[in-house]
Amino acid sequence: MKIIIVQSRVCFGGAEHVGVMLANALAEYHDVVLATNTQLEVSYAISDSVKVRNIFPSIPHGVRKWTGAIQQLRKLFVQEKPDVAIGILSTCSFICKVAGVGLGIPVVATEHDAFERPESAPMSRGNAFSKFWLNRLFDVVTVLTEADKQVIGNRLRRVVVMSNPLSLQPATVEGRNEFKDAEGNTFAKKPIVLAAGRLDSWHYKGFDVLLEAWAKVLARCKENIEAEGWRLCIAGKDEVDGLSHLQSLVRKLELGDSVSFLGFRKDMVRLYQEASVFALSSRYEGFGLVLVEAMSQGCACVSTDYKGRQKEIFGDAECGLLCPPEDAEALAEALQSVMTDATLRHRLQKNAIERSRFFMPLHIVKLWEQLLSEVVAARKK
């Protein structure tokens, strides 16, 4: 098959990372073109087998940027004559549909967040319109969980659950606190609780709740935590004022130097390998690829569970502790359990690695190949 994958950038985003991973995996057996903005930073490794094409004009933002992208994408469609196009996130899915008018190219739209929201972070009207109305334009819409498929019901043409693929090779357990990576290098865990996400999205990521929970843990186990050297480290890019807000909260809660903000990091694998515990504190989360990545490197995971979505990641395996979103007390209790009980922590770490293998690209790309073949065959009938 000839496949064109369209995304707005190849940096600073989980969905964008998934788009690149999908392009790389499909390019092993198919002709794949990645249409994107090559003028921006490239954060993710792109296979030499993937043809990369720029479709964005040198305009930073606005209507002209997107109309220019539509024009260039249509030219690319005419030139390449793809069997199918995949849009990464709603805007790129939409421009695929507009650019392909009259060309008979089926479009698969990919959604990367939840189709419902908590009252504390309601879905905007524009987002709801995109998810439940614009998505009716597409041959297929992929979602990340069965929970989202249930929310959608029969409102769209066809909905398929497609988990995000894992980009990392799972580690192996060598001893109680000793692990080995895919290259055979051993690493040991440190007394670190790691969290990751864009700091400007602190409310969505629940970093305020995480800091409140951390304060509770420190208050209850201060001597033990200080003796063992436990720290909370938050990795993530800051573009506006997320960092300053969170730093002020650290001061208010008197957390001192027990919390570190690491900024955007390209060495996330090393951070996962160093961390004994990974915390996902989101108020809502469509999937949580960072959770799977952390599991693969032997982190004992503590996660909020937004209406069953993160429970789907853990499956039936005992590989992490779940708690309700926006509940600092429950999050604190879970963190305290894995930090103070080494036997529990090691069991969760071992099981997490095994569960992460379900999300390996080979498994996910087979599901994608089957879906794309069905979409192409249906359009040719």
Locations of the language-model features?
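Aromatic "clamp/platform" in nucleotide-sugar-dependent glycosyltransferases that forms part
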Residues: F264, R283
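A short, well-ordered alpha-helix in the C-terminal region of glycosyltransferases
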Residues: A330, S337, L344-F358, Q370
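Conserved donor-binding/catalytic core segment of Leloir-type glycosyltransferases
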Residues: I4, T186-K205, L211-W214
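Donor nucleotide-sugar binding/catalytic pocket of nucleotide-sugar-dependent glycosyltransferases
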Residues: R53, R136-E174
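Conserved acidic donor-binding segment of nucleotide-sugar-dependent glycosyltransferases
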Residues: D316-A328, S337-A342
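Short His-centered aromatic/hydrophobic patch
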Residues: G87-S93, E111
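Short hydrophobic beta-strand element within catalytic cores of glycosyltransferases
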Residues: A300-T304
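N-terminal strand-loop element at the rim of the active site
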Residues: I5-G13, H17-M21, A25-K65, D148-G153, ...
